[in-house]
């Protein structure tokens, strides 16, 4: 079937594009809204970071849970020039090589020259020596020039040095 484009109307107030099309057969007409979307491209950066983990006492009343608690203090280098502060909770499994942790940290500084802050959420497990780690930007946590930031981060440790890989979209 041959489609004939019969008109376009740009509605600036709502940033919607309305396209009216007519079909050659049946002369049926319909209006189709399409949102104008600014192209967003995934970006990738990597670099080093320094980290200080400081053990903390268990929260009062939950000592029997045998959870580890630490503060996080990081300094990121490279295209992410930032400082982060956060907290981590961890638990060891009953079998050697099994454990888990969760952490939240607020990262403040510049990302490829754009200033602001955002929050990273960590979820990590070690299942009998096999690690699995997810670190993602908390939705809508970006501030200032980092508003709308989304993404995921990976961490590698080589020769006692810490490295990050950050895949992100910034509108």
Language model segments and positions:
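Targeting-peptide/extracellular-domain and disordered-appendage signature
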Residues: 4-5, 13-171
């Amino acid at each position: 079937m041959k489609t004939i484009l019969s008109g376009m109307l740009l509605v600036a107030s709502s940033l919607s594009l309305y396209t009216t099309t007519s079909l050659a057969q049946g002369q049926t007409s319909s209006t189709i809204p399409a949102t104008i979307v600014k192209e967003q491209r995934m970006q990738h950066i990597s670099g080093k970071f320094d980290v200080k983990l400081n053990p903390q006492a268990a929260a009062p009343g939950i000592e029997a849970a045998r959870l580890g608690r630490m503060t996080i203090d990081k300094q990121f280098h490279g295209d992410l020039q930032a400082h982060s502060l956060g907290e981590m909770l961890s638990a060891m499994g009953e079998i050697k090589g099994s454990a888990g942790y969760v952490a939240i940290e607020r990262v403040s500084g510049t990302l490829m020259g754009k200033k602001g802050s955002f929050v990273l959420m960590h979820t990590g497990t070690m299942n009998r020596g096999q690690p699995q780690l997810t670190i993602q930007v908390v939705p809508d946590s970006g501030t200032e020039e980092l508003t709308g930031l989304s993404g995921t981060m990976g961490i590698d440790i080589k020769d006692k040095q810490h490295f990050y890989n950050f895949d992100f979209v910034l509108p």
